């Protein structure tokens, strides 16, 4: 399954997505479920929903697809610059060593960092005009849909949840904006 949520690297104007499979039966089932549960007009063997992508979303995506490789390259450039120039020891980059060595590939839909004083860093960056987000504000095992997991002790998940902060990383950023983010994060060392 592929999400084309507007904030993604290949994002539509509204919600959109796609499913790819080499299984014809699964493809038929997915088509039916995304068409109100109908595999042919007025016949509904399944409970489904309207999940069809409209033509406008498809047209936007077909144009944006041409730029995806270049956009992802730019995101990688920004991420590399962050990893090489953010020197604040309070800010960590999970998995950075692997992608800097080229062991793994990454397209940086978001650029998450970990910081034990995450809330203070977020407020500081906000004061500097730098937008950030927490991905995601509620850890999966604490979601209402999983009440049976609420009592689980998941110390690593909970620590990451307390420390994760996503900093700006998108292809429209200028080099000057990227440097500004780095300088602000590095200066946070002296103020926190």
Predicted regions located by residue number:
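Conserved active-site segment immediately N-terminal to the catalytic lysine
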Residues: 1-12, 40-45
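PLP-dependent aminotransferase class I/II
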Residues: 22-192
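Adenylate-forming
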Residues: 12-16, 61
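Generic detector of well-ordered alpha-helical packing
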Residues: 4, 16, 55-56
